[in-house]
Amino acid sequence: MNLIAKLEQEEIERALAGKTIPEFAPGDTVIVNVNVVEGTRKRVQAYEGVVIAIRNRGLNSNFIVRKISSGEGVERTFQTYSPLLASIVVKRRGDVRRAKLYYLRERSGKSARIKEKLVSKDRTAAASQE
């Protein structure tokens, strides 16, 4: 492992101190809680939407979440290891066949729906036994 990769790995571990980032994939509906500073006040803002892309680049990893706000599509890019992220909660698993769901930008209504990934009973039983 070269020096830059080692430093990057240390920074990732430092950024994750006390935080856990759940496994999520494109198509999943997530709630991202972001720390927002307004003047002297600090508050947590929730942003809920569908993950349309994940970019894995070490410390520079990010993901794009898309939601419909007042009938208008809004996309926001989050840095995965940012200290501004309070938490990420996976609300629903989506069943898609693409890594990047940019085609959702042109779609609205029923055509923009994503099937839900149903976990079989065998997998849930195996997961609970471990």
Swiss-Prot record:
Keywords, ordered alphabetically: Ribonucleoprotein, Ribosomal protein
GO biological process: translation
Matching SUPFAM superfamilies: Translation proteins SH3-like domain
InterPro entries referenced in this protein's UniProt entry, alphabetically: Ribosomal_bL19, Ribosomal_bL19_CS, Ribosomal_bL19_sf, Translation_prot_SH3-like_sf
Keyword Transmembrane helix: no
One GO CC annotation: cytosolic large ribosomal subunit
Domain of life: Bacteria
Record keyword Transmembrane helix present: no
Pfam families: Ribosomal_L19 (PF01245)
GO molecular function: structural constituent of ribosome
NCBIfam families: rplS_bact
Protein family (similarity comment): Belongs to the bacterial ribosomal protein bL19 family.
PANTHER family (UniProt xref): LARGE RIBOSOMAL SUBUNIT PROTEIN BL19M (PTHR15680:SF9), RIBOSOMAL PROTEIN L19 (PTHR15680)
Biological function: This protein is located at the 30S-50S ribosomal subunit interface and may play a role in the structure and function of the aminoacyl-tRNA binding site.
Protein name in the entry: Large ribosomal subunit protein bL19
Organism in which the protein naturally occurs: Burkholderia ambifaria (strain ATCC BAA-244 / DSM 16087 / CCUG 44356 / LMG 19182 / AMMD) (Burkholderia cepacia (strain AMMD))
Taxonomic lineage from the root: Bacteria, Pseudomonadati, Pseudomonadota, Betaproteobacteria, Burkholderiales
